[in-house]
Amino acid sequence: MLVAAVQILTGGNLEENLELAVEKIREAAENGAQLIVLPEATSQAFGAGRLDEQAQGLDGSFATTIRAVAQQLGVTVVLGMFSPADTVERDGKTINRVSNTALIAGPVVLGGYDKIHTYDAFNYKESDTVRAGEALVAFDVAGITVGVATCYDIRFPEQFKELARQGAQVIVVPTSWADGPGKLEQWRLLTAARALDSTSYIVAAGQARPGGAEMAGQDSGPTGIGHSVVVAPDGTRVVEAGYEPEIIYAEIDSDLVAQTRKALPVLEA
């Protein structure tokens, strides 16, 4: 199975983001990809306005358009969007929270994974505006079981190990990874570690770096660092993007997953 990790840079306009996503999904499908992964916050970038104002359910125009395109092309798409969740009180204010949802859309599947681990770190508190999910999600594409995680989830190895124990051979990770000192090194280490922990392929699609490579390593990139990556179950980096928008491709070898798990039976521990 050929997978594509689509690295784009989205903004605050849902319709423009949808148009960009559809364009790149079509490009990846034309190049033979069966599973196409786009970043977290594809529908609306973080820091580009209130998330609840453009949040939609899986029956909204954003998700249904992606589903229609996926059906037309015969591919499965995973991408980040925001859906309405609940209302909470924070410091005397009423906040309409959203779910940070990874939409799963294809010919035979339409669902979503709600990010379990909200990004409450580095002086940021995502849980103020985003309700944490509770359930692990996996689905099948071309006879291969695919698990789903989102961005900050990658710091929690048990989620990846449990997905693998439930049958996942590939774990996709839509991401909007903030740039800053040491963040690229952390990203590379964590993606490789989760592949080794779960003896699964990791397919991580991130937002491109605002401002491109010239801004790399600075704290001014809160929405993306680029470097989308596919990591094999033995920790080998199969392909990695740079800072700019691009699409990367890799072939998933289920035999390699089986061989790695036989040689390195960490999931049995």
Report the location of each language-model feature.
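Short beta-strand scaffold segments in enzyme catalytic cores
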Residues: 79-81, 100-104, 137, 228-230, ...
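Extreme N-terminal starter segment of soluble prokaryotic enzymes
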Residues: 1-4
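Short hydrophobic-aromatic micro-motifs
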Residues: 36, 145-150, 172, 202-203
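Short, acidic/polar
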Residues: 16-26, 155-161
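Active-site catalytic loop in hydrolytic enzyme cores
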Residues: 87-166, 179-189, 193, 259-266
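Short polar catalytic/cofactor-binding loops
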Residues: 7-14
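CN hydrolase (nitrilase-like) catalytic-core segments centered on the catalytic cysteine
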Residues: 59-78, 155-246
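Cys-nucleophile CN-hydrolase/nitrilase-fold catalytic domain and related Cys-dependent amidase chemistry
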Residues: 14, 23-106, 178-200
